[in-house]
Amino acid sequence: MRKQILFAIFSLATLIIHADEGMWMLPDLKTQNEIAMRELGLEIPIEEVYNANGLSLKDAVVHFGGGCTGEVISSEGLVLTNHHCGYGAIQQHSNVEHDYLTEGFWAMNRDAELPTPGLKVTFIDRILDVTDYVNEQLKKDKDPEGTNYLSPTYLNKVAERFAKAENIEITPATKLELKAFYGGNKYYLFVKTVYSDIRMVGAPPSSIGKFGADTDNWMWPRHTGDFSLFRIYADKNGKPAEYSKDNVPLHVKKHLTISLAGVQEGDFTFVMGFPGRNWRYMISDEVEERMQTTNFIRQHVRGARQKVLMEQMLKDPAVRIHYASKYASSANYWKNAIGMNEGLVRLKVL
């Protein structure tokens, strides 16, 4: 499943600590999961989790940047996300004189919040199962060269056709994204609204936000203060707009409140967000290729690159700051590749 897609991931705890773990598409919760969720302790109406025609939790869970999840936690567009998700923005604002990576950053008032060019926050307005429509289009359309068939370019055209046929309102800030799931057996259309005036509000120093660094990455339990804060700005009418000093904090439709009561044993819990993708349906040959080709190359090429980067970063603070985000991005799936191969060998998957 791709990063751009909104899922619910459940760890459904009961008094006997049974976990029903998995990833589900939000529109399918009512038909596929509601009964089990209620048996395991869900109390709110399922429509409060996902409602295509009204407010629900999906209106407070956002796609942050290129592949992360954020949660809107105030009525004025304050977004909580991971430190590693905000890391590129923190690096973008850092220099030798103001090393926010090392020292952290806190805006003490709205005027001190830092505009972050290139950073976007995306709300999911609707998720539509368009499988039948796409299959009809696939039967009609011909691609003699075979190069664009089911490509993002082709699927975008199909999305535009569907939106026009169904009279879906499109604004300059609307983004349509059509994705194939389950090996092309299901197709979902995501109708999104994108905000591009995003400002950094706060981040702890890396000694907290990146505690453990690569040693602890992909390891659990963790002891990292892995959080950062940003705010969504819009024009005076609440519409998405490029940065302007006249923009104001977005008055959101819904935000999450944070309970100070904590979580008790047996509480029902679930996580909504953009968790990346999985390859649960790989055949053994694909797993072998992942281990021996993709992961092997990723481990050794990235390892060599990171060695060169680190040597230079240790010599010069300006170089360290400049390459901090690139190094962290490279190291993330370098560590993942190593751990994945070790796990597959240990569990004798092949």
Language-model features: locations:
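Positively charged n-region of N-terminal signal peptides that target proteins for export
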Residues: 1-4
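Bacterial N-terminal signal peptides
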Residues: 7-14
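Terminal presequence/propeptide segments associated with secretion/organelle targeting
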Residues: 16-350
